[in-house]
Protein backbone atom coordinates (compact mmCIF):
# COMPACT_ATOMS: atom_id res chain seq x y z
CA UNK A 1 0.00 0.00 0.00
CA UNK A 2 2.77 2.47 0.88
CA UNK A 3 4.51 1.92 -2.46
CA UNK A 4 1.33 2.72 -4.38
CA UNK A 5 0.84 5.80 -2.22
CA UNK A 6 4.36 7.04 -2.94
CA UNK A 7 4.15 6.41 -6.66
CA UNK A 8 0.67 7.90 -6.92
CA UNK A 9 1.69 11.08 -5.11
CA UNK A 10 4.83 11.40 -7.23
CA UNK A 11 2.95 10.98 -10.49
CA UNK A 12 0.23 13.44 -9.44
CA UNK A 13 2.80 16.06 -8.46
CA UNK A 14 4.67 15.53 -11.73
CA UNK A 15 1.48 16.05 -13.71
CA UNK A 16 0.61 19.14 -11.69
CA UNK A 17 4.08 20.49 -12.37
CA UNK A 18 3.55 20.13 -16.12
CA UNK A 19 0.14 21.80 -15.89
CA UNK A 20 1.50 24.70 -13.83
CA UNK A 21 4.38 25.24 -16.25
CA UNK A 22 2.03 25.30 -19.22
CA UNK A 23 -0.48 27.58 -17.51
CA UNK A 24 1.79 29.62 -15.27
CA UNK A 25 0.65 32.97 -16.65
CA UNK A 26 -2.88 32.18 -15.45
CA UNK A 27 -2.10 30.44 -12.19
CA UNK A 28 0.40 33.01 -10.97
CA UNK A 29 -2.06 35.89 -11.05
CA UNK A 30 -3.29 35.29 -7.50
CA UNK A 31 -0.40 33.33 -5.99
CA UNK A 32 2.28 35.13 -3.99
CA UNK A 33 5.89 33.99 -4.02
CA UNK A 34 5.83 32.96 -0.37
CA UNK A 35 2.82 30.70 -0.95
CA UNK A 36 4.55 29.00 -3.88
CA UNK A 37 7.50 28.11 -1.66
CA UNK A 38 5.32 27.12 1.28
CA UNK A 39 3.24 24.74 -0.85
CA UNK A 40 6.38 23.10 -2.23
CA UNK A 41 7.78 22.74 1.29
CA UNK A 42 4.56 21.08 2.44
CA UNK A 43 4.85 18.57 -0.40
CA UNK A 44 8.40 17.73 0.65
CA UNK A 45 7.27 17.35 4.27
CA UNK A 46 4.61 14.93 3.07
CA UNK A 47 7.31 12.90 1.32
CA UNK A 48 9.26 12.86 4.59
CA UNK A 49 6.19 11.54 6.40
CA UNK A 50 5.93 8.70 3.88
CA UNK A 51 9.67 8.06 4.26
CA UNK A 52 9.27 7.71 8.02
CA UNK A 53 6.46 5.24 7.44
CA UNK A 54 8.66 3.19 5.10
CA UNK A 55 11.43 3.10 7.73
CA UNK A 56 8.86 1.81 10.19
CA UNK A 57 7.82 -1.00 7.83
CA UNK A 58 11.35 -1.96 6.81
CA UNK A 59 12.67 -5.20 8.37
CA UNK A 60 16.44 -5.27 8.90
CA UNK A 61 16.43 -9.07 9.18
CA UNK A 62 15.18 -9.78 5.66
CA UNK A 63 17.67 -10.27 2.83
CA UNK A 64 16.90 -8.70 -0.53
CA UNK A 65 14.36 -6.15 -1.63
CA UNK A 66 11.29 -5.43 0.47
CA UNK A 67 7.94 -3.71 -0.08
CA UNK A 68 8.07 -4.79 -3.71
CA UNK A 69 5.26 -3.60 -5.92
CA UNK A 70 4.61 -3.51 -9.66
CA UNK A 71 3.29 -0.15 -10.81
CA UNK A 72 2.89 0.98 -14.43
CA UNK A 73 4.65 -2.27 -15.42
CA UNK A 74 7.76 -1.36 -13.44
CA UNK A 75 8.93 -3.15 -10.31
CA UNK A 76 9.67 -0.95 -7.30
CA UNK A 77 11.22 -1.88 -3.97
CA UNK A 78 13.89 -1.03 -1.42
CA UNK A 79 16.69 -2.71 0.49
CA UNK A 80 18.92 -1.43 3.28
CA UNK A 81 21.17 0.42 0.86
CA UNK A 82 18.47 2.29 -1.02
CA UNK A 83 16.61 2.97 2.24
CA UNK A 84 19.35 5.17 3.64
CA UNK A 85 20.02 6.94 0.37
CA UNK A 86 16.31 7.77 0.26
CA UNK A 87 16.53 9.01 3.86
CA UNK A 88 19.46 11.23 2.90
CA UNK A 89 17.49 12.62 -0.04
CA UNK A 90 14.45 13.38 2.09
CA UNK A 91 16.58 15.22 4.64
CA UNK A 92 18.41 17.33 2.07
CA UNK A 93 15.43 18.27 -0.12
CA UNK A 94 13.82 20.72 2.34
CA UNK A 95 17.28 22.06 3.24
CA UNK A 96 18.06 22.76 -0.41
CA UNK A 97 14.69 24.45 -0.89
CA UNK A 98 14.99 26.65 2.21
CA UNK A 99 18.63 27.51 1.48
CA UNK A 100 17.47 29.81 -1.34
CA UNK A 101 14.34 30.91 0.50
CA UNK A 102 15.02 34.59 -0.19
CA UNK A 103 14.99 34.10 -3.95
CA UNK A 104 11.64 35.90 -4.18
CA UNK A 105 13.00 39.27 -3.06
CA UNK A 106 14.28 40.27 -6.48
CA UNK A 107 12.65 37.72 -8.76
CA UNK A 108 9.33 37.45 -10.54
CA UNK A 109 6.80 34.74 -9.79
CA UNK A 110 7.65 32.60 -12.81
CA UNK A 111 11.29 32.31 -11.74
CA UNK A 112 10.31 31.40 -8.18
CA UNK A 113 7.90 28.77 -9.49
CA UNK A 114 10.59 27.42 -11.80
CA UNK A 115 12.98 27.17 -8.88
CA UNK A 116 10.68 25.21 -6.56
CA UNK A 117 9.52 22.92 -9.36
CA UNK A 118 13.10 22.11 -10.33
CA UNK A 119 13.91 21.17 -6.73
CA UNK A 120 10.81 18.97 -6.51
CA UNK A 121 11.43 17.31 -9.87
CA UNK A 122 15.08 16.56 -9.07
CA UNK A 123 14.07 15.08 -5.71
CA UNK A 124 11.35 12.94 -7.28
CA UNK A 125 13.70 11.61 -9.95
CA UNK A 126 16.38 10.69 -7.42
CA UNK A 127 13.93 8.89 -5.11
CA UNK A 128 12.50 6.96 -8.04
CA UNK A 129 16.04 6.04 -9.08
CA UNK A 130 16.67 4.51 -5.66
CA UNK A 131 13.47 2.43 -5.62
CA UNK A 132 13.24 1.21 -9.24
CA UNK A 133 14.15 -2.43 -9.86
CA UNK A 134 14.65 -2.59 -13.60
CA UNK A 135 17.57 -1.62 -15.80
CA UNK A 136 15.85 0.60 -18.36
CA UNK A 137 14.11 2.73 -15.75
CA UNK A 138 17.33 2.95 -13.75
CA UNK A 139 19.26 4.34 -16.71
CA UNK A 140 16.53 6.79 -17.69
CA UNK A 141 16.26 8.12 -14.14
CA UNK A 142 20.05 8.08 -13.71
CA UNK A 143 20.35 10.60 -16.54
CA UNK A 144 17.03 12.39 -16.03
CA UNK A 145 18.46 14.63 -13.32
CA UNK A 146 20.61 16.32 -15.97
CA UNK A 147 17.88 18.44 -17.54
CA UNK A 148 16.44 20.06 -14.37
CA UNK A 149 19.96 20.51 -12.99
CA UNK A 150 21.01 22.11 -16.28
CA UNK A 151 18.15 24.60 -16.02
CA UNK A 152 18.73 25.22 -12.30
CA UNK A 153 22.39 26.10 -12.86
CA UNK A 154 22.01 27.89 -16.19
CA UNK A 155 19.06 30.07 -15.18
CA UNK A 156 19.41 30.48 -11.43
CA UNK A 157 23.15 30.16 -10.88
CA UNK A 158 25.49 32.87 -9.65
CA UNK A 159 25.86 36.07 -11.65
CA UNK A 160 29.13 37.93 -12.23
CA UNK A 161 29.64 41.02 -10.07
CA UNK A 162 31.89 44.02 -10.45
CA UNK A 163 33.84 45.73 -7.69
CA UNK A 164 30.81 47.71 -6.50
CA UNK A 165 28.67 44.59 -6.04
CA UNK A 166 26.56 45.52 -9.06
CA UNK A 167 25.38 42.70 -11.27
CA UNK A 168 27.01 42.70 -14.69
CA UNK A 169 24.35 42.04 -17.30
CA UNK A 170 25.79 40.92 -20.60
CA UNK A 171 24.39 42.48 -23.75
CA UNK A 172 22.11 40.59 -26.08
CA UNK A 173 24.64 40.85 -28.90
CA UNK A 174 27.52 39.63 -26.75
CA UNK A 175 28.59 36.21 -28.00
CA UNK A 176 30.15 35.25 -24.67
CA UNK A 177 28.11 33.14 -22.31
CA UNK A 178 27.98 33.72 -18.58
CA UNK A 179 30.01 31.44 -16.28
CA UNK A 180 26.83 29.81 -14.96
CA UNK A 181 25.74 28.92 -18.50
CA UNK A 182 29.19 27.49 -19.19
CA UNK A 183 28.94 25.40 -16.03
CA UNK A 184 25.52 24.10 -17.08
CA UNK A 185 26.88 23.03 -20.47
CA UNK A 186 29.88 21.41 -18.80
CA UNK A 187 27.84 19.08 -16.62
CA UNK A 188 25.40 18.31 -19.42
CA UNK A 189 28.01 17.43 -22.04
CA UNK A 190 30.39 15.57 -19.72
CA UNK A 191 27.81 13.31 -18.12
CA UNK A 192 25.63 12.83 -21.19
CA UNK A 193 28.56 11.72 -23.35
CA UNK A 194 29.90 9.31 -20.73
CA UNK A 195 26.45 7.87 -20.19
CA UNK A 196 26.43 6.52 -23.75
CA UNK A 197 29.02 3.93 -22.69
CA UNK A 198 26.85 3.07 -19.73
CA UNK A 199 23.85 2.64 -22.01
CA UNK A 200 25.82 0.19 -24.16
CA UNK A 201 26.68 -1.95 -21.13
CA UNK A 202 23.10 -1.95 -19.87
CA UNK A 203 21.96 -2.93 -23.36
CA UNK A 204 24.28 -5.95 -23.24
CA UNK A 205 22.89 -6.90 -19.84
CA UNK A 206 19.33 -6.76 -21.16
CA UNK A 207 20.24 -8.76 -24.27
CA UNK A 208 21.89 -11.50 -22.22
CA UNK A 209 19.15 -11.93 -19.63
CA UNK A 210 16.27 -11.13 -22.03
CA UNK A 211 14.73 -9.19 -19.16
CA UNK A 212 15.06 -5.82 -17.49
CA UNK A 213 14.71 -6.88 -13.83
CA UNK A 214 17.69 -6.46 -11.47
CA UNK A 215 17.21 -9.85 -9.87
CA UNK A 216 17.73 -11.68 -13.16
CA UNK A 217 21.29 -10.35 -13.41
CA UNK A 218 22.25 -12.68 -10.57
CA UNK A 219 21.15 -15.69 -12.62
CA UNK A 220 23.48 -15.30 -15.62
CA UNK A 221 27.09 -16.36 -16.10
CA UNK A 222 29.13 -14.12 -18.37
CA UNK A 223 32.49 -14.76 -19.98
CA UNK A 224 35.49 -12.69 -18.91
CA UNK A 225 35.52 -10.86 -22.25
CA UNK A 226 31.85 -9.94 -21.99
CA UNK A 227 32.25 -8.91 -18.36
CA UNK A 228 35.15 -6.67 -19.40
CA UNK A 229 33.08 -4.91 -22.05
CA UNK A 230 30.21 -4.33 -19.63
CA UNK A 231 32.53 -3.23 -16.82
CA UNK A 232 34.44 -0.71 -18.94
CA UNK A 233 31.25 0.87 -20.26
CA UNK A 234 29.72 1.14 -16.80
CA UNK A 235 32.82 2.40 -15.05
CA UNK A 236 33.38 5.19 -17.59
CA UNK A 237 29.91 6.58 -16.94
CA UNK A 238 30.23 6.14 -13.19
CA UNK A 239 33.69 7.67 -12.77
CA UNK A 240 32.65 10.76 -14.74
CA UNK A 241 29.54 11.10 -12.58
CA UNK A 242 31.51 10.74 -9.33
CA UNK A 243 33.93 12.29 -10.58
CA UNK A 244 37.60 11.28 -10.30
CA UNK A 245 40.83 12.34 -11.96
CA UNK A 246 41.20 13.02 -14.89
CA UNK A 247 37.47 13.53 -15.67
CA UNK A 248 36.84 15.82 -12.71
CA UNK A 249 37.11 19.25 -14.31
CA UNK A 250 33.37 19.83 -14.61
CA UNK A 251 32.61 19.54 -10.88
CA UNK A 252 34.52 22.58 -9.48
CA UNK A 253 33.11 24.85 -12.19
CA UNK A 254 29.57 23.59 -11.67
CA UNK A 255 29.75 24.02 -7.89
CA UNK A 256 31.26 27.48 -8.23
CA UNK A 257 28.44 28.74 -10.45
CA UNK A 258 25.50 26.82 -8.96
CA UNK A 259 22.96 28.39 -6.64
CA UNK A 260 23.39 27.11 -3.12
CA UNK A 261 20.47 24.70 -3.55
CA UNK A 262 22.14 23.26 -6.65
CA UNK A 263 25.40 22.68 -4.76
CA UNK A 264 23.55 21.00 -1.90
CA UNK A 265 21.69 18.64 -4.22
CA UNK A 266 24.72 17.90 -6.39
CA UNK A 267 27.18 17.27 -3.55
CA UNK A 268 24.68 15.73 -1.17
CA UNK A 269 22.69 13.44 -3.44
CA UNK A 270 23.42 13.34 -7.17
CA UNK A 271 27.04 12.19 -7.05
CA UNK A 272 25.91 9.40 -4.70
CA UNK A 273 24.08 7.91 -7.67
CA UNK A 274 27.48 6.75 -8.93
CA UNK A 275 28.10 4.73 -5.76
CA UNK A 276 24.60 3.30 -6.02
CA UNK A 277 25.17 2.35 -9.68
CA UNK A 278 28.32 0.42 -8.75
CA UNK A 279 26.32 -1.61 -6.25
CA UNK A 280 23.40 -2.30 -8.55
CA UNK A 281 25.20 -2.85 -11.86
CA UNK A 282 28.79 -3.93 -11.17
CA UNK A 283 29.22 -5.72 -7.84
CA UNK A 284 26.34 -8.10 -8.36
CA UNK A 285 27.66 -10.03 -11.38
CA UNK A 286 31.05 -8.77 -12.55
CA UNK A 287 33.17 -10.19 -9.73
CA UNK A 288 35.64 -11.99 -12.00
CA UNK A 289 36.55 -8.90 -13.96
CA UNK A 290 36.56 -6.69 -10.84
CA UNK A 291 39.56 -8.69 -9.61
CA UNK A 292 41.35 -7.94 -12.88
CA UNK A 293 40.58 -4.22 -12.98
CA UNK A 294 40.78 -3.47 -9.25
CA UNK A 295 44.46 -2.38 -9.40
CA UNK A 296 43.52 0.15 -12.09
CA UNK A 297 40.57 1.47 -10.06
CA UNK A 298 42.75 1.82 -6.97
CA UNK A 299 45.51 3.53 -8.94
CA UNK A 300 42.99 6.06 -10.27
CA UNK A 301 41.75 6.59 -6.72
CA UNK A 302 45.26 7.22 -5.36
CA UNK A 303 46.10 9.58 -8.23
CA UNK A 304 42.86 11.44 -7.54
CA UNK A 305 43.69 11.85 -3.85
CA UNK A 306 47.23 13.13 -4.48
CA UNK A 307 46.54 15.30 -7.52
CA UNK A 308 43.30 16.87 -6.29
CA UNK A 309 44.71 17.30 -2.80
CA UNK A 310 47.73 19.23 -4.05
CA UNK A 311 45.86 21.48 -6.48
CA UNK A 312 43.29 22.24 -3.78
CA UNK A 313 46.03 23.95 -1.79
CA UNK A 314 46.48 26.46 -4.62
CA UNK A 315 42.81 27.38 -5.00
CA UNK A 316 41.53 30.81 -3.99
CA UNK A 317 37.82 30.23 -4.75
CA UNK A 318 36.13 29.07 -1.55
CA UNK A 319 33.41 27.09 -3.32
CA UNK A 320 35.98 25.39 -5.57
CA UNK A 321 37.92 24.30 -2.48
CA UNK A 322 34.82 22.58 -1.09
CA UNK A 323 34.13 21.04 -4.51
CA UNK A 324 37.62 19.53 -4.67
CA UNK A 325 37.11 18.23 -1.15
CA UNK A 326 34.11 16.28 -2.45
CA UNK A 327 36.25 14.64 -5.12
CA UNK A 328 38.76 13.38 -2.54
CA UNK A 329 36.07 11.93 -0.30
CA UNK A 330 34.34 10.19 -3.19
CA UNK A 331 37.68 8.73 -4.36
CA UNK A 332 37.97 7.01 -0.98
CA UNK A 333 34.38 5.81 -1.31
CA UNK A 334 35.06 4.36 -4.78
CA UNK A 335 38.16 2.52 -3.58
CA UNK A 336 36.54 1.07 -0.49
CA UNK A 337 33.42 -0.12 -2.31
CA UNK A 338 35.65 -2.32 -4.49
CA UNK A 339 37.43 -3.81 -1.45
CA UNK A 340 35.17 -6.90 -1.39
CA UNK A 341 34.67 -6.89 2.37
CA UNK A 342 31.86 -5.72 4.60
CA UNK A 343 33.96 -3.07 6.35
CA UNK A 344 34.96 -1.44 3.08
CA UNK A 345 31.51 -1.39 1.51
CA UNK A 346 29.86 -0.18 4.71
CA UNK A 347 32.55 2.49 5.00
CA UNK A 348 31.92 3.60 1.43
CA UNK A 349 28.22 4.08 2.09
CA UNK A 350 28.83 5.80 5.43
CA UNK A 351 31.31 8.20 3.80
CA UNK A 352 28.72 8.92 1.12
CA UNK A 353 26.04 9.67 3.72
CA UNK A 354 28.42 11.69 5.93
CA UNK A 355 29.60 13.68 2.94
CA UNK A 356 25.94 14.26 2.12
CA UNK A 357 25.63 16.17 5.40
CA UNK A 358 29.05 17.81 5.80
CA UNK A 359 29.55 19.12 2.27
CA UNK A 360 26.11 20.85 2.09
CA UNK A 361 26.89 22.45 5.46
CA UNK A 362 30.12 23.90 4.08
CA UNK A 363 28.44 25.07 0.89
CA UNK A 364 25.69 26.65 2.97
CA UNK A 365 28.29 28.55 4.98
CA UNK A 366 30.51 29.80 2.16
CA UNK A 367 27.95 29.93 -0.64
CA UNK A 368 24.72 30.59 1.19
CA UNK A 369 26.00 33.06 3.78
CA UNK A 370 29.23 34.70 2.63
CA UNK A 371 28.51 34.82 -1.09
CA UNK A 372 24.90 35.95 -0.68
CA UNK A 373 26.02 38.83 1.52
CA UNK A 374 29.24 39.98 -0.14
CA UNK A 375 29.11 38.45 -3.65
CA UNK A 376 32.68 37.22 -3.74
CA UNK A 377 34.11 33.70 -3.68
CA UNK A 378 37.76 34.77 -3.34
CA UNK A 379 39.35 33.54 -0.13
CA UNK A 380 41.50 36.69 0.20
CA UNK A 381 38.44 38.90 0.07
CA UNK A 382 37.55 37.84 3.62
CA UNK A 383 39.68 38.13 6.72
CA UNK A 384 39.13 38.40 10.46
CA UNK A 385 35.50 37.26 10.22
CA UNK A 386 35.75 35.76 13.71
CA UNK A 387 35.70 39.31 15.07
CA UNK A 388 32.57 40.43 13.24
CA UNK A 389 30.67 37.17 12.60
CA UNK A 390 31.32 35.00 15.69
CA UNK A 391 28.40 32.60 15.18
CA UNK A 392 29.34 32.02 11.55
CA UNK A 393 32.93 31.42 12.62
CA UNK A 394 31.96 28.77 15.17
CA UNK A 395 29.82 26.90 12.67
CA UNK A 396 32.49 27.08 9.95
CA UNK A 397 35.07 25.70 12.37
CA UNK A 398 32.78 22.83 13.40
CA UNK A 399 31.87 22.02 9.79
CA UNK A 400 35.56 21.99 8.91
CA UNK A 401 36.28 19.57 11.75
CA UNK A 402 33.51 17.29 10.51
CA UNK A 403 34.94 17.43 7.00
CA UNK A 404 38.33 16.40 8.38
CA UNK A 405 36.75 13.38 10.07
CA UNK A 406 36.91 14.33 13.73
CA UNK A 407 35.97 11.49 16.16
CA UNK A 408 32.31 11.28 17.19
CA UNK A 409 31.28 12.36 13.70
CA UNK A 410 29.85 10.12 10.98
CA UNK A 411 32.72 11.22 8.73
CA UNK A 412 35.18 9.62 11.15
CA UNK A 413 33.26 6.33 11.21
CA UNK A 414 33.04 6.24 7.41
CA UNK A 415 36.73 7.00 6.86
CA UNK A 416 37.82 4.56 9.57
CA UNK A 417 35.79 1.69 8.10
CA UNK A 418 36.79 2.57 4.54
CA UNK A 419 40.50 2.64 5.27
CA UNK A 420 40.18 -0.64 7.19
CA UNK A 421 38.40 -2.19 4.23
CA UNK A 422 41.08 -0.95 1.83
CA UNK A 423 43.77 -2.28 4.19
CA UNK A 424 42.17 -5.73 4.16
CA UNK A 425 42.28 -5.66 0.36
CA UNK A 426 45.79 -4.19 -0.01
CA UNK A 427 47.90 -2.62 2.72
CA UNK A 428 49.96 -0.48 0.31
CA UNK A 429 46.89 1.20 -1.16
CA UNK A 430 45.58 1.76 2.37
CA UNK A 431 48.79 3.51 3.43
CA UNK A 432 48.70 5.72 0.34
CA UNK A 433 45.01 6.48 0.96
CA UNK A 434 45.79 7.95 4.37
CA UNK A 435 47.30 10.92 2.51
CA UNK A 436 43.71 12.08 2.11
CA UNK A 437 43.48 12.61 5.87
CA UNK A 438 46.55 14.84 5.97
CA UNK A 439 45.78 16.86 2.86
CA UNK A 440 42.15 17.37 3.93
CA UNK A 441 43.33 18.72 7.27
CA UNK A 442 45.78 21.10 5.59
CA UNK A 443 43.44 22.70 3.07
CA UNK A 444 40.52 22.79 5.50
CA UNK A 445 42.59 24.60 8.12
CA UNK A 446 43.93 26.93 5.43
CA UNK A 447 40.37 27.82 4.44
CA UNK A 448 39.31 28.33 8.06
CA UNK A 449 42.28 30.44 9.12
CA UNK A 450 42.21 32.62 6.01
CA UNK A 451 38.53 33.42 6.49
CA UNK A 452 38.34 33.80 10.24
CA UNK A 453 41.65 35.27 11.36
CA UNK A 454 44.26 37.83 10.34
CA UNK A 455 43.96 41.54 9.71
CA UNK A 456 40.67 43.18 8.81
CA UNK A 457 39.84 42.82 5.12
CA UNK A 458 40.38 46.00 3.11
CA UNK A 459 37.59 45.00 0.73
CA UNK A 460 34.71 44.97 3.22
CA UNK A 461 33.30 47.91 5.10
CA UNK A 462 33.39 47.06 8.80
CA UNK A 463 30.03 48.66 9.45
CA UNK A 464 28.41 46.56 6.71
CA UNK A 465 29.42 43.38 8.53
CA UNK A 466 27.76 44.15 11.86
CA UNK A 467 24.37 42.45 12.00
CA UNK A 468 25.18 40.21 9.04
CA UNK A 469 25.90 37.12 11.10
CA UNK A 470 24.01 33.85 10.65
CA UNK A 471 20.23 34.34 10.78
CA UNK A 472 17.62 32.01 12.28
CA UNK A 473 16.82 30.30 8.97
CA UNK A 474 20.47 29.49 8.33
CA UNK A 475 20.98 28.36 11.92
CA UNK A 476 18.09 25.93 11.57
CA UNK A 477 19.56 24.35 8.43
CA UNK A 478 23.06 24.07 9.88
CA UNK A 479 21.78 22.59 13.14
CA UNK A 480 19.83 19.92 11.26
CA UNK A 481 22.92 18.89 9.28
CA UNK A 482 25.15 18.90 12.37
CA UNK A 483 22.57 16.92 14.35
CA UNK A 484 22.61 14.00 11.92
CA UNK A 485 26.42 14.02 11.61
CA UNK A 486 26.76 13.75 15.39
CA UNK A 487 23.83 11.36 15.90
CA UNK A 488 25.09 8.82 13.36
CA UNK A 489 28.67 9.38 14.49
CA UNK A 490 27.80 8.42 18.05
CA UNK A 491 25.37 5.66 17.07
CA UNK A 492 26.30 4.46 13.55
CA UNK A 493 24.44 1.22 14.15
CA UNK A 494 21.25 3.08 13.24
CA UNK A 495 22.51 2.86 9.66
CA UNK A 496 24.75 -0.20 9.75
CA UNK A 497 22.07 -2.59 11.00
CA UNK A 498 20.06 -1.86 7.86
CA UNK A 499 23.07 -2.35 5.58
CA UNK A 500 24.59 -5.62 6.82
CA UNK A 501 22.41 -8.14 5.00
CA UNK A 502 22.26 -6.13 1.79
CA UNK A 503 26.04 -5.73 1.72
CA UNK A 504 26.77 -9.37 2.57
CA UNK A 505 25.06 -10.44 -0.66
CA UNK A 506 27.53 -8.32 -2.68
CA UNK A 507 30.67 -10.16 -1.54
CA UNK A 508 32.38 -12.70 -3.79
CA UNK A 509 35.06 -15.37 -3.35
CA UNK A 510 38.20 -14.54 -5.37
CA UNK A 511 39.36 -17.31 -7.69
UniProtKB/Swiss-Prot annotation:
Protein function: Core subunit of the mitochondrial membrane respiratory chain NADH dehydrogenase (Complex I) that is believed to belong to the minimal assembly required for catalysis. Complex I functions in the transfer of electrons from NADH to the respiratory chain. The immediate electron acceptor for the enzyme is believed to be ubiquinone.
Record's GO cellular component terms: mitochondrial membrane
Family listed: Belongs to the complex I subunit 4 family.
Any matching Pfam family: Proton_antipo_M
Segments crossing the lipid bilayer: 1-21, 39-59, 78-98, 116-136, 137-157, 186-206, 220-240, 264-284, 289-309, 318-338, 349-369, 388-408, 422-442, 476-496
Subcellular location: Mitochondrion membrane
Reactions accelerated catalytically: a ubiquinone + NADH + 5 H(+)(in) = a ubiquinol + NAD(+) + 4 H(+)(out)
Record keywords: Electron transport, Membrane, Mitochondrion, NAD, Respiratory chain, Translocase, Transmembrane, Transmembrane helix, Transport, Ubiquinone
An individual GO BP term: ATP synthesis coupled electron transport
Keyword S-adenosyl-L-methionine: no
InterPro entries membership: NADH_Q_OxRdtase_chainM/4, NADH_UbQ_OxRdtase, ND/Mrp_TM
Membrane topology: Multi-pass membrane protein
MF (Gene Ontology): NADH dehydrogenase (ubiquinone) activity; ubiquinone binding
Protein name: NADH-ubiquinone oxidoreductase chain 4
Gene: ND4
Principal location listed in the UniProt entry: mitochondrion
EC number: 7.1.1.2
Keyword ATP-binding: no
Amino acid sequence: MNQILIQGVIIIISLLSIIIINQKDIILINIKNKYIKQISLLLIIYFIYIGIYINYLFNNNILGFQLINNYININWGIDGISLWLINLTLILLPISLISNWNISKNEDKSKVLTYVLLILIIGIIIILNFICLDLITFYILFEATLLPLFILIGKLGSLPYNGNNKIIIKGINNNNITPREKAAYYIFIYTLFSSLFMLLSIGIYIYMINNIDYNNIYNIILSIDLQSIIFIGLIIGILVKTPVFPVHTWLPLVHAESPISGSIILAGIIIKLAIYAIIRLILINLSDVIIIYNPLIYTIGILTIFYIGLITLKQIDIKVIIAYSSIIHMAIAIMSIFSNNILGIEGSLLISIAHGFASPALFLLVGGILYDRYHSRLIYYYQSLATYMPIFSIYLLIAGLFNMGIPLSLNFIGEFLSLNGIFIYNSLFAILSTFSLFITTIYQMKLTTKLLYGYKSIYINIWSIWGNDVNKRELLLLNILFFFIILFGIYPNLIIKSLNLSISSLLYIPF
